[in-house]
Regions:
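Positively charged n-region of N-terminal signal peptides that target proteins for export
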Residues: 1-4, 16
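Bacterial N-terminal signal peptides
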Residues: 7-15
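Sec/Tat signal peptide C-region and signal peptidase I cleavage site
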Residues: 17-21
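Short, solvent-exposed loop/hinge segments that bridge or flank secondary-structure elements
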Residues: 23-77, 132-148
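Generic short beta-strand segments
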Residues: 33-41, 81, 107-108, 124-128
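Contiguous, well-ordered beta-strand patches that form the walls/edges
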Residues: 63-117
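Short, exposed beta-strand-loop hairpins at the edges of beta-sheets
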Residues: 121-136
């Protein structure tokens, strides 16, 4: 009977440890890089051209780098740049309590991010025609954490 009680105590302790490990907030600091397609009305520094909002949209390839400079619990911040423009545009992200979903903003648009693995995420980004660039974009693509 003593062994059964000991086994039960160990099982409960193990389950509690596993639950705490699953609840751990992921560390997302570092450099993330990805490529994808973006739908663009008009133009902006990351999607250059002479197109206007009145013209048909265009699809472009984009390559972005997000550097998550800091993280405090579920809040993270950093800077974004693209192959077309090294703007180092600031962003702010907030992670949900399930530790997989992130929402965020930069100076003219919004992020919706899903953490797929410790070093992989799907990043969706949009900004409206009311943004400072007077362009409109929508995109989703995978990003990988750059290993050093």
């Amino acid at each position: 009977m003593r062994y059964l009680a000991l086994a039960l105590v160990l099982a409960v302790a193990g389950a509690a440890t596993l639950a705490r490990a699953q609840d751990a907030i992921p560390d997302i600091k570092g450099t993330w890089s990805g490529k994808g397609k973006v739908l663009v009305f008009g133009n902006n520094v990351h999607n250059p051209g002479k197109q206007t909002m009145a013209e048909a949209p265009r699809m472009r390839d984009i390559e972005m780098t997000d550097v998550v400079e800091g993280q405090d619990g579920r809040l993270a911040w950093g800077r974004s740049s693209s192959r077309a423009a090294d703007t180092k545009e600031p962003f702010a992200w907030a992670m949900s309590s399930v530790n997989k979903s992130i929402v965020g903003a930069d100076t003219d648009g919004y992020f919706r991010i899903t953490l797929l693995a410790p070093d992989r995420m799907e990043k969706c980004y949009v900004h409206s025609g009311m943004s400072p660039s007077k362009s409109m974009v929508a995109t989703c693509y995978a990003m990988e954490r750059v290993k050093k």
